[in-house]
């Protein structure tokens, strides 16, 4: 009988132990396990979100880089066009200035040539008059001298 009482005592003690564990030990363990499961699930969800965010950021960075390259190429193209325009304007301005200087030089040369011709005509007229005076050995009055010079200048 002793065996039966021991078995009943052990059964009662086991039942009390199970009840005590279910009442006081099991709930905190289950709470800890559930909290750990929740943290792990949240961590995995955060990791998935981070991977998606990283992919979006990389795609956005790639798009921005492409856009920046396009913008840079446009700016370079505009700068090259502007450079060509400035060069053409400078060439046109230089050609105009060159033509102006050439025309001015030609005008100065023509004016100097005319002045030299006029001086030469006057000198020739003076020499002709002096030669005529010596030949005629007489002096011509200034009014007659002026008329002769003017006629001689017109003829030359």
UniProtKB/Swiss-Prot annotation:
This is ATP synthase subunit b. The chain crosses the membrane at residues 7-27. The lineage of its organism: Bacteria, Pseudomonadati, Pseudomonadota, Gammaproteobacteria, Alteromonadales. Its main location: membrane. Belongs to the ATPase B chain family. The keyword Cell membrane applies. It is a single-pass membrane protein. Keywords: ATP synthesis, Cell inner membrane, Cell membrane, CF(0), Hydrogen ion transport, Ion transport, Membrane, Transmembrane, Transmembrane helix, Transport. One of its GO terms (molecular function) is proton-transporting ATPase activity, rotational mechanism. F(1)F(0) ATP synthase produces ATP from ADP in the presence of a proton or sodium gradient. F-type ATPases consist of two structural domains, F(1) containing the extramembraneous catalytic core and F(0) containing the membrane proton channel, linked together by a central stalk and a peripheral stalk. During catalysis, ATP synthesis in the catalytic domain of F(1) is coupled via a rotary mechanism of the central stalk subunits to proton translocation. Pfam families: ATP-synt_B. It is found in: Cell inner membrane. The keyword Cytoplasm does not apply. F-type ATPases have 2 components, F(1) - the catalytic core - and F(0) - the membrane proton channel. F(1) has five subunits: alpha(3), beta(3), gamma(1), delta(1), epsilon(1). F(0) has three main subunits: a(1), b(2) and c(10-14). The alpha and beta chains form an alternating ring which encloses part of the gamma chain. F(1) is attached to F(0) by a central stalk formed by the gamma and epsilon chains, while a peripheral stalk is formed by the delta and b chains.
């Amino acid at each position: 009988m002793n065996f039966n009482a021991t078995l009943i005592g052990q059964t009662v003690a086991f039942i009390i132990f199970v009840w005590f564990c279910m009442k006081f030990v099991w709930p905190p363990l289950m709470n800890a396990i559930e909290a750990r499961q929740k943290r792990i699930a949240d961590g995995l969800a955060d990791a998935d979100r981070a991977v998606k965010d990283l992919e979006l950021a990389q795609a956005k960075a790639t798009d921005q880089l492409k856009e920046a390259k396009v913008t840079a190429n446009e700016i370079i193209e505009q700068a090259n066009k502007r450079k060509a325009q400035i060069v053409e304007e400078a060439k046109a301005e230089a050609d105009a200035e060159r033509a102006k200087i050439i025309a001015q030089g030609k005008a100065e040369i023509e004016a100097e040539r005319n002045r030299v011709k006029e001086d030469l005509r006057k000198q020739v007229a003076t020499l002709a008059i002096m030669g005529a005076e010596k030949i005629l050995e007489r002096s011509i009055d200034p009014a007659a001298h002026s008329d002769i010079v003017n006629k001689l200048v017109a003829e030359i």
